[in-house]
Design a protein with these regions (language model features):
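RNA-binding accessory domains that recognize and position tRNA/RNA substrates
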Residues: 1-188, 197, 203-380
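Extended catalytic-interface subdomain
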Residues: 192-194
């Protein structure tokens, strides 16, 4: 139903309107009815603001007093109230969400934050090393490094279903944290970088489930921690603004998003180590060439996937039967919708040439042209 209802006012409306999948604002003002229907699939933030502004500020007499400084101060106070003098264990992947959560929790509780970086073997090339350097050496955070590569890959052997992979990875993450917590004294809370799109896409009473998110749907029933999720009200662009407000460096705040399950949802189907390596190496080439071309600051998210089937090709004047690599590059404002980035052909040709020459067991490169919707940003 509606998020807010005025006391004493009956809501005389067909309840199915709240399950229609279309954003709707409706209000009864005296005997007049005011409603705003927003464009369902658009990244035009200014158009959305123009549609909502008269209703919010003229009809409802709202005041424009929300800003990121106030949000940070409010969340710091809320975290202090929730946690007190106890300790929080944070899953620090080094991505935007977990980095901003770490900075916010450090501001709120200081040394009572214990950061754990788990290398599950599904990280991008050199990423775990970067996390240790940035957080352990530069930011001087209380950082514990856990190499759980063999543990995760063994659990994932033969698992094809993407939902099952996500739940295995999410559940194993929590169990690793539980084990680390037993080695420490007084860990009562688990910090998470859950943001608003995670909540929406994982399903609510009024939203159909799209996919389970690593921060939401993978938690096991025997979870022994109380959750601390200070970013759950924010969209991705607001998370970045929060990071800037907290003083994090540009390269950390504006790095491209990376899913919790990592390359596990980009090595499609059952994960094999050789195909996982093909994803990692092709992704590294794509990121390097996008940086050289200046696209790393223009494109919101870009990555490669390797499916669990092969294609016929020619290598060294002989028939080859090897994997394709699929490139995906999208732009979005809030991660709820996404458009395709029209990358220039010379750049794509250079990337293709490098992947075919440098990545083992690959004989074909494709470019994904599917927007969100109908496709999601990730393949799994």
């Amino acid at each position: 139903g509606p998020c807010n209802v005025v006391d004493g006012v009956a809501i005389d409306v067909n309840p199915s309107i709240y399950e229609a999948g279309i954003p709707v604002i409706a209000a009864g003002h005296d005997k007049a009815t005011c409603a705003v229907k927003l464009p369902q699939f658009t990244d035009d933030i200014e158009a959305i603001k123009a549609a909502v502004k008269p209703f919010v500020f003229e009809t409802c007499k709202a005041e424009a007093n929300w800003n990121m400084t106030n949000f940070v101060n409010d969340q710091v106070e809320l975290v202090r109230r929730q946690v007190g003098n106890r300790k929080v264990l944070l899953a620090l992947s080094g991505g935007v969400d977990s980095s901003v959560v770490a900075a916010l929790l450090l501001k709120a509780i200081g040394d009572n934050l214990v950061c754990v970086h788990v290398n599950h073997g599904l990280m991008r090339k050199g990423e775990s090393e970067d996390v240790v350097e940035m957080f352990g050496n530069q930011l001087k955070a209380n950082l514990i490094y856990v190499d759980a590569t063999e543990r995760f890959l063994t659990k994932l052997e033969g698992v094809e279903d993407p939902e099952q992979k996500r739940k295995i990875i999410g559940g194993e993450f929590i169990r690793v944290f539980e084990e680390e917590a037993r080695k420490l004294d007084g860990i009562d809370f688990l910090g998470q970088g859950t943001i608003y799109p995670d909540i929406v896409e994982s399903g609510t009473k009024t939203a159909k489930m799209v996919k389970s998110h690593h921060n939401v749907g993978g938690l096991p029933e025997d979870l022994q921690f109380e959750l601390v999720e200070p970013l759950r009200q924010l969209f991705k662009d607001e998370v970045r603004a929060c990071g800037v407000e907290l003083g994090l460096p540009y390269e950390m705040v504006y790095r491209q998003p990376f899913p919790g399950p990592g390359l596990g949802v980009r090595c499609l189907g059952a994960i094999t180590r050789d195909r996982l390596e093909a994803v990692r190496e092709s992704d590294a080439i794509l990121r390097e060439e996008f940086r050289i071309a200046g696209l790393d600051k223009k494109v919101w998210q870009y990555f490669t996937v390797v499916p669990d089937f092969k294609s016929v090709g020619v290598r060294d004047n002989a028939r080859s039967f090897e994997w394709p690599v699929i490139i995906r590059a999208v732009n979005t404002i809030d991660a709820m919708t996404a458009t395709i980035e029209p990358v220039e052909w010379p750049i794509l040709m250079k990337i293709t040439d490098r992947i075919l020459k440098e990545v083992k067991h690959v004989n074909r490169v494709c470019y994904d042209m599917s927007p969100k919707p109908n496709a999601t940003i990730e393949w799994e």
